[in-house]
Amino acid sequence: MVKRALLSVSDKEGIVQLAQNLSSFNIEILSTGGTAKLLRESGIDVRDVSEVTGFPECLDGRVKTLHPAVHGGILAIRDNANHMDTLKELEITPIDLVVINLYPFKETILKSDVTLAEAIENIDIGGPTMLRAAAKNHRDVTVIIDPKDYHRVLEEIKENGDTKLDTRYQLALKVFQHTAQYDALIADYLGKQISEEKIGANTITLTYEKVQDLRYGENPHQKAGFYKEIGANKGTLVDGVQLHGKELSFNNINDANGALELLKEFQEPTVVAVKHTNPCGVASGTNIEEAWHKAYESDPLSIFGGIVAANRAVTKTMAAAMKEIFLEVIIAPNFTEEALEVFKEKKNLRLIKIEDICNGNHHSYQIKKVQGGILLQEDDHILFEQLDVVTEKEPTEEEKEDLAFAFKIVKHVKSNGIVFVKNKQTLAIGPGQTSRIWALENAVKNTTHSLKGSVLASDAFFPFRDCVDTAFGAGVKAIIQPGGSINDGVSIKACNEHGISMVFTGFRHFKH
């Protein structure tokens, strides 16, 4: 039976109604500080915890509930005669219901002007201690951390005078999940005051919050969900607002993220089309409409069923053209009212608005799940520091611009990756081959464009001269690659024979 409850919350949502109902069930209410004040002002009979402990709140409220009279009442096992005799001897009354939520540490550290001192003052000590005590003793004690659970608990107490064991177990689990996240956020925040570096730490604790359940995963037989990091979501899908269309799927989110990662490489008006996380059309232009037209023309076949991301507002002209194609998702910093009107006819097309699409921060690290653990690495944020011309012929300024453009793209192509570019427009892309020459040959074979006068980017070095010979045969005038092969000299010689310029970056960009 629930006879005594302790209520102490930072989030006051629903607490008055909860206390009113508990009082109507003749349950004694203990409370502290602001919660007790609010309940009294609402006409509810409340007993201060300091009355129970015989010790006043002190140190500006830092010490309120850390006392055996509180924790003994929570932790005592009710059918353990020794425990109950001890409570009687010490004049401690059992506490059957604990309702706590914690100081708003997460909300505090998300403020742009937060200080370390302010963050530290919002680290709750007594709250987690009581929560964990009640959760540990959930066989006898009900614990609530989430106001959404108030109604469920009240209904069970009203019906049975107590909660069900299964309910108490679920609520206890919720507490341990929450306090684990709470401590992880504190550790992460304090760690960042010393260094942003996670890699190299002996232990890593990662915490995420659910955004939504997904209908299924990569395939219909796989369960899936979408979770977000705490903070650091500027310019990401989590930061976006869906304006139109069906709910995003697992594959939509994965592909859209790939499009965003690539789009963030560019500041000038650019459109990116992605299919199965690989770019299939990328172009920049003097304005976003030109960029869209060029990106679509890059590969009108592969864009079917793809994801499109633009770094400027989508216009009516773009919308009219996009409407004629089957697209899964369109992402942009904005959509004109006229564009939204055009898209109304496409009920399933998902439109996502991400205002900070250009300025959002890249992740500082990447995680890959492997059997038995994770791989953790820095984000691949370096393109190159300088271009080292290694051939007799030097690329023109226009070719250098195209080379840099192509290298930004190939960095986001599954390895082995090859990209052909001309006038800041992809003409052919060869992704995900086990042989570099196959990637190059597939790109040449599958394009509908002439590659004459184009430039070529490779995500890693050429092991043999066959790539240079094939590129020359396709009409390539300049090549950008990391270099670093023991056969670099052979590739350089081939370029010189064909009159092709080639630059080395010194940075490889494998993507798996």
Curated annotation (Swiss-Prot):
Sorted alphabetically, the keyword list is: Hydrolase, Multifunctional enzyme, Purine biosynthesis, Transferase
- Reactions the enzyme catalyzes: (6R)-10-formyltetrahydrofolate + 5-amino-1-(5-phospho-beta-D-ribosyl)imidazole-4-carboxamide = 5-formamido-1-(5-phospho-D-ribosyl)imidazole-4-carboxamide + (6S)-5,6,7,8-tetrahydrofolate; IMP + H2O = 5-formamido-1-(5-phospho-D-ribosyl)imidazole-4-carboxamide
Q: Which pathway does the record list?
A: Purine metabolism; IMP biosynthesis via de novo pathway; 5-formamido-1-(5-phospho-D-ribosyl)imidazole-4-carboxamide from 5-amino-1-(5-phospho-D-ribosyl)imidazole-4-carboxamide (10-formyl THF route): step 1/1; Purine metabolism; IMP biosynthesis via de novo pathway; IMP from 5-formamido-1-(5-phospho-D-ribosyl)imidazole-4-carboxamide: step 1/1
- Name one cellular component (GO) term: cytosol
**EC number of the protein:** 2.1.2.3, 3.5.4.10
Database matches in PROSITE patterns: MGS
| Boundaries of every MGS-like domain copy | 1-145
Repressor as a keyword of this entry, yes or no, is no
What is a GO molecular function of this protein? phosphoribosylaminoimidazolecarboxamide formyltransferase activity
The cross-references to Gene3D superfamilies, in alphabetical order and at most eight, read: 3.40.140.20, Methylglyoxal synthase-like domain
Is Electron transport there in the keyword field? no
What CDD domains has UniProt attached to this entry? IMPCH
One GO BP annotation here? Answer: 'de novo' IMP biosynthetic process
> So which domain of life are we looking at?
Bacteria
Domain comment in the entry = The IMP cyclohydrolase activity resides in the N-terminal region.
What the record says about family reads: Belongs to the PurH family.
**This protein's name:** Bifunctional purine biosynthesis protein PurH
The species this protein was found in: Alkaliphilus oremlandii (strain OhILAs)
